[in-house]
Amino acid sequence: MTDLLLGIDIGTTNIKAVLATPTGRIIAQAQNDYPIHYPQPGWAEQDPADWWRGVVTVTRVVLAQAAVRSDQVVGIGVSGQGCAVTLIDAAGEVVHV
């Protein structure tokens, strides 16, 4: 099976992935939850590293479920949880305000 499409949704509480054919037949799907941190009352934040680990995890899971190679994926679509801005410093570390 070749020409597969990978859809990734980075949501508020988890990441979901779907592997499908160009005609829309779902081959595999997976999700990975991650925490919301509350550093003080009225604040909520997430660690972008959790998002990345989640993307890697669900991608590996759907590829394994479908028993396909990554080079069979010809397109990737990503949706996110709204307009989120992640500030990083020169070393690539998250800046906490």
Residue ranges of model-derived segments:
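N-terminal glycine/serine-rich phosphate-binding loop of ATP-dependent small-molecule kinases
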Residues: 1-97
